[in-house]
Amino acid sequence: MDLPGGHLAVVLFLFVLVSMSTENNIIRWCTVSDAEDQKCLDLAGNATARNLRGQLVCVRGQSPTDCMKQIKNGTADASTMYADEIYTAGFCYGLDVAVGESYNGVDGINYYVVALARTSSSDLSLLEMHERSSCHPGMRTTVGWTVPIGFLVNTSQISVDVQCNFPHAVGDFFGYSCVPGVKDPEHDPKGNNPRNLCEACIGDENDRHICANNPRERHFGEAGALRCVAENLGDVAFVKHTTVFDNMQGKNQESWALDLELEDLKLLCPDGSEANLFQHESCHLAVVPTNAVVVRLEDKCRVYKFLERVQNAFGNTTEGFSLFSSVNYGQPDVLFSDSTKKLLRVMGTYTSWLGPSYTTILRAFECEGLC
């Protein structure tokens, strides 16, 4: 049947509107594992069954960086990322965040990075750490490397050469340390990272696996870094503010932990002062934010509104699909952290979510070529 020109124009206009509306309601979520794929598909199916407005489509990425590229290029719309990944997404790819996880339902604070020392060490200052000994949970970890080394760079205690060789700068600065993994091929492909960065490590009970990037090195991880200081093998340990409390009062049955008292330890503050263990909110190296959902700037509102509907439907469920539970997926923290109480809308930029202390820390590493 022939349509008059005016009627045909109206039909075409309506077709375009419907097509644009349908496309605008589709959220393409970039996943990086089989577990994320499955939970994304389950979320999509449950959202459809509940007649939630918007359609979730799952898109596979090879890595968080690949997801950043896909979101920038428009082949994906959203993906949950860690704090350091959020910085890269914003700094290198011009992306932003729509919502962030909240573990207390109020703010987006994940944890504080603190510097622990023995109370008996009366002459210690974070502004005078040259030739001191240090204990780190692991190489290239946020708590054990990025935050403390970034702090030392930003306070002009460490200077990095034109090759941007952080391990050599750190080795030259500290007298000796335990940085598990610093000699692993992944972090030391040429085999020339300073050996003194392993001298406070102790390996296993048979003196093997010294400086290994796994629990066979007894000073590995946050509990290991705490042990390193507790046993007087290091002057300072860089850990989360919860580490001490997670390993005391019988929670850790190893002999070194059972012998430790709260009064034995103190916090070292960035201004050179000291504080007790309960004053982490005012005495810390950085506040590390929770994970957030990375999007294109123009999609902040659209993705937020979709996730708000999803959260209202599946955020607090005790039966059936649960947005903040990973019990059916073989590993924790799939798509979202299991400890998430609520998703918070991010009105500002990605740097406002990351916060000034953490953003400043990350800028110290820009010479490594994030992009």
From Swiss-Prot:
Protein origin, superkingdom: Eukaryota
Compartments where found: Secreted
Principal subcellular localisation of the protein: secreted
Domain Transferrin-like: 27-367
Signal peptide: 1-21
Membrane-spanning parts: none
This protein's UniProt keywords: Secreted, Signal
Presence of the UniProt keyword Secreted in the record: yes
Record SUPFAM superfamilies: Periplasmic binding protein-like II
GO biological process, one term: otolith development
Entry's Gene Ontology cellular component terms: early endosome; extracellular space; plasma membrane; recycling endosome
Gene3D superfamilies in the record: Periplasmic binding protein-like II
Keyword Metal-binding: no
Described function: Required for normal otolith growth and deposition of otolin-1 in the otolith.
Subunit text: Interacts with OTOL1.
Protein name: Otolith matrix protein 1
Organism for this UniProt entry: Danio rerio
Gene name per UniProt: otomp
